[in-house]
From Swiss-Prot:
SMART domains on file: LMWPc
Swiss-Prot/TrEMBL catalytic activity: arsenate + [thioredoxin]-dithiol + H(+) = arsenite + [thioredoxin]-disulfide + H2O
Key words of the record: Arsenical resistance, Cytoplasm, Disulfide bond, Oxidoreductase, Redox-active center
Top-level taxon of origin: Bacteria
Protein name: Arsenate reductase
EC code(s) of this entry: 1.20.4.4
Length: 134
């Protein structure tokens, strides 16, 4: 258990994209990775993100919206920013923490199909990472 790696998904509000990424991460990576998400701010989990994940039988009602925790950030093996704002303003990561940017559109305030599209794109990206390490 202790030799699990840590992956940290970050976006602006820890409301939609990073919440969905955390859920997909737990599904696809949970046996090898500790999966966390956070935001530059904490806007609360978007009800449509909960609904979108329910459609694929993943329950995120118990996930919380959190601001970036320096302890997790500094010990993460991989930090993934999901929006350009988070990529630009994310606190600097130590040199030994690998950081990548996987950009996704923000579905907040958009029509329902956007939540479904972004949910599926994030799921596919994390599934690919679980299979290829990239």
């Amino acid at each position: 258990m202790e030799n699990k790696k840590t992956i940290y998904f970050l976006c602006t509000g820890n409301s939609c994209r990073s919440q969905m990424a955390e859920a997909w991460g737990k599904q696809y990576l949970g046996d090898k990775w500790n999966v966390y998400s956070a935001g530059i701010e904490a806007h609360g989990v978007n009800p449509n993100a909960i609904k979108a994940m329910n459609e694929v039988n993943i329950d995120i009602t118990n996930q919380t919206s959190d601001i970036i925790d320096a302890n997790i950030l500094n010990r993460a093996d991989l930090v993934v920013t999901l929006c350009s704002h988070a990529d630009a303003v994310c606190p600097s990561t130590p040199p030994d923490v690998h950081r990548v940017h996987w950009g996704f559109d923000d579905p907040a305030g958009k029509e329902w199909s956007e939540f479904q599209r972004v949910r599926d794109e994030i799921g596919e990206r994390i599934k690919r990472f679980s299979e290829t390490g990239e």
